[in-house]
A protein has these predicted regions:
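Glycine-rich phosphate-binding active-site loops on the catalytic face of alpha/beta enzymes
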Residues: 136-151, 210-212, 254-256, 265-285
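Active-site-adjacent beta->alpha loops and helix N-cap segments on the catalytic face
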Residues: 88-92, 122-127, 146-168, 217-236, ...
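Catalytic-face loop-and-helix region of soluble metabolic enzyme cores
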Residues: 103, 238-246, 257-343
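Active-site beta->alpha loop and helix N-cap motifs at the rims of alpha/beta catalytic domains
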Residues: 76-163, 169
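Active-site glycine- and acidic-residue-rich loops that bind
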Residues: 52, 147-155, 174-193, 250-257
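Catalytic cores of alpha/beta
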Residues: 119-132, 180-184, 188-189, 252-267
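Hydrophobic faces of well-ordered beta-strands that scaffold small-molecule active sites
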Residues: 46-52, 72-76, 106-116, 139-143, ...
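C-terminal extensions of enzymes
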Residues: 1-21, 319-421
Length: 421
């Protein structure tokens, strides 16, 4: 979309208040997740949510988004912000700067992914941190208290949500995303979303455990993508009265043209991709159909003509060896922070090939997700409202007394693992 388009210019005056406070004079197309999710849902499209573990990822994603007039999300998870160069403080500024380099016109939201809550201390910290992310220009949040049992998940999610501006996009989660074989149930989802509704909390999206996993599917161990579309649709259909759709996590390793292209049929509106974009930065060999990292000889395979230079990859391998990691470990993600500045300082030829490949894969997702043209739909939606505020016109239809600790579907807690991203 052209940054001087009349409707785009009109929509800029209706961006979220926190965005206008920071970038009133900057024609950056940063909007609320509420508007982007609603526009995608209306048009049977899926929004690509790209985890920018390295800031340069955001540039390639925004370039593809502008080229195809597709609304996207740039995101980072709470845990990722502790081991990546991107964090809650700097990623919005990086995204706005990259948008400026492109001449603006890209339509996107800044999404706090997997804001993990594992107990009371995290809830109390969130009271302060939600104010901080608002001040930094974020426009959407995913609360993830799925580590807790259903009753405490409901209570913690409710308490944190009450400290998020209601004009932000809101995603919640029930059932930890662990991989094939352990699925969220319709009963859990109805209890969770009904309970939130009874307190006046209106999520746009719910993340569920439906067979996907975060990170790499290790084919040498027989791991394969196993998204259960039937369970996904059953939950999506059950939640229609609440206006809640599905956020699909763990997409890296999923066939883009044959599987991702089906998502909209099953109530999915948002698609998260993280590890694939990290693979691009590092130049790790990937399956061409899925973006899953190829493992050979118990090791990732570095391709010399992709991503960072081989010499820098050797430094990363040595660093990870020093931390006791296997050479196919998912913990290679923790090298992002240690090597962020070195990557940003690389000669242009390396940065350009990272951005170019990021753009290529983003385009594939946009097309498979039927997301071309969704940026224009977001702008139209923003402009036809009587107010700038995208808070949806939903009603409380559930009764608080029906959602108690004693009738929660599950009473147990987490198994001790960390599946947050």
């Amino acid at each position: 979309m052209k940054s001087d388009d009349k409707t785009y210019t009109q929509a800029l005056s209706r961006r979220p208040l926190n965005v206008r406070r920071l970038w009133e004079e900057e024609p950056v197309g940063l909007f609320s997740g509420r508007d982007i999710f609603a526009a995608a849902k209306e048009n049977r499209a899926i929004v690509l949510a790209a985890n920018a573990r390295h800031p340069i990822t955001a540039k390639g994603v925004l370039r593809a988004a502008k080229k195809h007039d597709a609304a996207v999300l740039i995101e980072i998870a709470k845990s990722e912000a502790n081991y990546c160069g991107s964090n809650f403080s700097n990623l919005p500024e990086y995204a706005v700067n990259y948008s400026r380099e492109l001449g603006h016109g890209a339509v996107f939201a800044m999404h706090v992914d997997h804001y993990g809550i594992k107990g009371r201390d995290d809830v109390m910290k969130a009271v302060t941190q939600m104010g901080e992310v608002t001040a930094r220009g974020w426009t959407s949040v995913a609360i993830d208290a799925s580590h807790l049992d259903d009753w405490n998940n409901l209570c913690a999610t409710r308490d944190v949500a009450m400290h998020i501006p209601p004009y932000f996009g809101l995603e919640v989660e029930v059932g930890e995303i662990k991989g094939p074989g352990e699925f969220s149930t319709v009963e859990e989802a109805l209890y969770f979303i009904g309970g939130l509704n009874s307190w006046g909390i209106f999520p746009d999206l719910i993340a569920i455990s439906n067979g996907s996993k975060h990170g790499t599917y290790d084919k040498t161990l027989g791991q394969n993508e196993g998204i259960n579309f039937e369970r996904t649709k059953a939950i999506a259909d059950a939640l229609k009265p609440y206006g809640v759709s599905i956020a699909q996590h763990g997409i890296s390793g999923t066939n883009i043209e044959t599987r991702c292209s089906q998502f909209a049929q099953y109530g999915i509106v948002k698609g998260n991709v993280a590890t694939l974009f990290q693979n691009i930065v590092f130049g790790i060999k990937m399956e061409p159909e899925t973006g899953n990292a190829v493992i050979e000889g118990d090791s990732y395979v570095k391709e010399a003509d992709r991503g960072i230079p081989a010499e820098l990859w050797d430094e990363i391998v040595a660093w990870c060896d020093g931390k006791g990691m296997s050479r196919k470990s998912g913990d290679y993600k923790k090298a992002n922070l240690a090597f962020c500045d070195k990557i940003l300082a690389l000669p242009e030829k390396y940065l350009n090939r990272i951005v170019d490949e990021t753009e290529y894969w983003t385009e594939r997702f946009i097309k498979a997700f039927n997301a071309e043209g969704t940026a224009e739909k977001v702008i139209e939606r923003v402009c036809r409202r009587t107010s700038w505020n995208p808070l949806p016109d939903r009603k409380i239809i559930a009764h608080r007394g029906d959602y108690r600790a004693d009738n929660a579907p599950t009473k147990g807690g987490n198994d001790g693992g960390d599946y947050s991203e």
